[in-house]
Amino acid sequence: MAVFMERPNGDGWAHLVSDLHGETGRVELRAFLKVIGVRRPLHRAHTYAEHCDIRGTEINRARNAGAELISWRELARLLRKKRHTENSVSKSQRLLSRP
């Protein structure tokens, strides 16, 4: 239940992600983007790697709004965890839907 921001790269861009998977994470990320005044579509929407690229003053607004700053390695770990969670949920849903 947090929004994380990868440390900005040399070009001044950063990735903003939610730690929650699925629709819950998507809603959290979109709500956060609305708070900081960013209106652009999410990249890789509906996947574990769903994120938004932000830059310049958007980065400052994200930090001021409470985004937790993480390294690219921490971001990779977070995305792997989300992928594992989504795969587990999908498998459970398939098993439950069998006749």
What are these regions, as identified by a protein language model?
Residues 1-98:
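Catalytic phosphate/metal-binding cores of nucleic-acid and nucleotide-processing enzymes, i.e., regions
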